[in-house]
Amino acid sequence: MNRIHAVILDWAGTTVDFGSFAPTQIFVEAFRQAFDVEITLAEARVPMGLGKWQHIEALGKLPAVDARWQAKFGRSMSAADIDAIYAAFMPLQIAKVIDFSSPIAGVIDTIAALRAEGIKIGSCSGYPRAVMERLVPAAAEHGYRPDHWVATDDLVAGGRPGPWMALQNVIALGIDAVAHCVKVDDAAPGISEGLNAGMWTVGLAVSGNEFGATWDAYQTMSKEDVAVRREHAASKLYAAGAHYVVDSLADLPEVIAHINARLAQGERP
């Protein structure tokens, strides 16, 4: 049938961890612990969505971070430096990720609504498997259990922005066509992943990395501040090529209804 058969969901900032704070805070701590180099939360967010080693590599190439590194060490960050920061990052992230495993508001009801429509729930993450093996059961205790998940280091081909994790979900879930899949993410590399896989893509402008607020901060934010931050996040996600941008996963069923109507008219992603 010419309709959406599966959604492939990101984790932090999409289904759990409103604001995607678990990885950002740990990057700051890992740089400090490994080399006594300070980076800001805003800098830590810039490459979000990539695999974590690649994320550290991208952070080292940010002009401001590179300038700090050059001032301290007289050279740019090396692969060995990235390995050292990653080695500091991993135990910190494994220890802390369960503290950020609660589903974002609306996720559980949305998953139930999608499953009621016969839609399968795939997922993938920029987290490596060692982190996912802690996060997945912790999220399950809170009621979020996707049908399949893939970690960024599971596949030889690699992770985002390549299509491979999304396509591995297609295979595992037995979906007949990539045009019958929707990739949902709160960061640009995840949107690129979906586009490269030939899927419809939906960006989340409020619940995730680009908006960058805790749930409590969001709840007390003025309408004006919300509007400014939403527009900033949405512009980045649209620039990455997202077909749709909404606030959070709670808005996804309406988007899928719209995509189903387009599929019925013969449209493709």
UniProtKB/Swiss-Prot annotation:
Pfam families referenced in this protein's UniProt entry, alphabetically: Hydrolase
Domain of life, source organism: Bacteria
Note on how the cofactor is bound: Binds 1 Mg(2+) ion per subunit.
Chain sites annotated for binding Mg(2+): 10, 12, 186
Known catalytic reactions: phosphonoacetaldehyde + H2O = acetaldehyde + phosphate + H(+)
Chain's role: Involved in phosphonate degradation.
Family of the protein in this entry: Belongs to the HAD-like hydrolase superfamily. PhnX family.
Protein name per the record: Phosphonoacetaldehyde hydrolase
Species of provenance: Salmonella agona (strain SL483)
